[in-house]
Structure formats: structure tokens, C-alpha cells
């Protein structure tokens, strides 16, 4: 994980160093690098480098739960829904660097076996991302957008299913076989915008111990794919 974060930092630094400049040394804003079209094609009403943007994202999360406690270790992945809205604000005029946040509904969890019996976890969260994004223009209307940051999450629903005991109960309760509601972690990813269309992928690493066992760590993780539109 540390190597991945370092590679992303080097990538962003390299892209920043390759920025174009006016003869007097001032950086050329990305919106001006393609002449009078300001970075978007003739007839388009959307500017990739406006100071603010809003968007809708729809995708899937391939999630796991890794735990030192055998009855919580859902290290086999399960797939869930990931849908939400985002908003971004440019934070400097020296580079196309943005702060992005929003709100999403995400389904995480996992599946595995305990004492020979199958179990599954479905963990439903509301998530608040806190990200720094760099928009690098590669052609008119096309940007590559690496980002990194973190997220905060609140568990709002879900089920634990124990197929051996033929039982199902709430994912978030005070029971030893369930989970704490609050989660949070790191997020790293990269997207691409084609005019208003957005596609992207990200990886979440949970940092909070979401299990009720104080001496055995239980953490979530997920790989996410998204499509969406930006305004």
C-alpha cells in the first residue's frame, strides 16, 4: 500500500512538472492549452476545468472483510452496489488540482466458512469521501484523473447469514458476531473523463477495527468500478 501511494505521488509530481508555461514563466492554465476552445470541442457546453463540478456515479464494489477472528473473516469477496453523488472544487490556480467530496451508498462485506459452515456478510454504508484529484488533459475533452485521500462511513443496514445455524441477523449490533457501525480508511484511484462521461476505479483500505473484538482486528476492503456523468 505504501508503495502504491508513493507511485501515485510520483505520478502527480511528474504531471505537474510537465505543465506548459508562457514565455514569462507563468503556467498556462489547462483550459487554455488547446487554443480558443478552452479544452473542449466546438459546440460543447462543458468545461473540464471549471472551478467547480458536480456528478453522479454508479458502480459496483467487490468487497472483503479480513479478520483475525475466524468467525468474522469473510476474505472471499462479494459484489455489491455503489451509487452516489460527487462535488469538486478547484483548490489552486497553479495546477488542475481539485478537492472532491460527496455522499454514496455502498454495499461491502464478504463470505467464508467457520467450523465448516458457510456464512455471508452484507454491510451497507453511507460514505463520505475526502479526496484530492489531479485532472491531467491528454486531448480535447479527455482528462486522466488520479486521486487519493480517505473516506468516513456509517453502517445503515445489512445482514449476517449463518447457513449452518440457518440464522440471519443484523450486521450492526452489539453481538460478537456482528460489526461496529463506524468505519473509515484510505482510498486511491484513477478515473478518466470524456466530455461529460466519467469512468473510474478505486481501492479502499479500511483502517478502523469494525469488529467487537478489541484484541483481534477486523477491517474492510473493496475494489470499486464506476461510470457516471459530470456537470
Where are these regions (language model features)?
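Hydrophobic h-region of N-terminal signal peptides that target proteins for export
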Residues: 10-18
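Surface-exposed loop and membrane-interface regions of Gram-negative outer-membrane beta-barrel proteins
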Residues: 99-123
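Outer-membrane beta-barrel translocator domains and adjoining extracellular loop/strand segments
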Residues: 66-72, 111-117, 158-167, 211-216
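Outer-membrane beta-barrel "beta-signal"
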Residues: 196, 219-231
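Outer-membrane beta-barrel transmembrane domain signature
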Residues: 89-97, 118-210, 231
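Positively charged n-region of N-terminal signal peptides that target proteins for export
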Residues: 1-4, 20
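Short glycine/proline- and aromatic-enriched beta-strand/turn motifs that initiate or cap beta-hairpins
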Residues: 20-82
Amino acid at each position: 500500500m505504501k508503495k502504491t501511494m508513493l507511485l501515485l505521488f510520483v505520478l502527480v509530481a511528474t504531471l505537474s512538472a510537465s505543465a506548459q508555461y508562457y514565455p514569462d514563466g507563468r503556467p498556462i492554465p489547462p483550459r487554455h492549452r488547446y487554443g480558443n476552445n478552452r479544452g473542449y470541442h466546438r459546440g460543447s457546453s462543458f468545461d473540464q476545468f471549471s472551478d467547480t463540478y458536480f456528478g453522479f456515479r454508479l458502480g459496483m464494489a467487490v468487497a472483503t472483510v479480513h479478520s483475525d477472528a475466524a468467525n468474522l473473516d469473510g476474505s472471499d469477496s462479494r459484489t455489491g452496489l455503489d451509487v452516489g453523488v460527487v462535488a469538486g472544487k478547484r483548490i489552486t490556480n497553479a495546477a488542475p488540482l481539485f478537492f472532491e467530496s460527496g455522499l454514496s451508498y455502498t454495499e461491502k462485506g464478504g463470505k467464508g466458512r467457520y467450523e465448516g459452515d458457510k456464512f455471508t456478510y452484507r454491510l451497507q454504508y453511507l460514505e463520505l469521501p475526502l479526496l484530492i484529484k489531479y485532472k491531467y488533459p491528454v486531448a480535447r475533452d479527455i482528462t486522466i484523473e488520479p486521486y487519493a485521500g480517505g473516506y468516513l462511513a456509517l453502517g445503515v443496514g445489512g445482514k449476517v447469514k449463518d447457513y449452518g445455524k440457518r440464522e440471519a441477523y443484523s450486521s450492526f449490533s452489539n453481538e460478537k458476531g456482528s460489526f461496529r457501525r463506524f468505519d473509515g480508511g484510505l482510498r486511491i484511484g484513477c478515473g478518466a473523463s470524456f466530455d461529460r462521461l466519467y469512468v473510474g476505479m478505486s481501492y479502499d483500505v479500511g483502517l478502523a477495527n469494525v469488529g467487537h473484538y478489541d484484541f483481534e482486528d477486523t477491517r474492510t476492503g473493496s475494489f470499486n468500478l464506476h461510470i457516471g456523468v459530470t456537470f
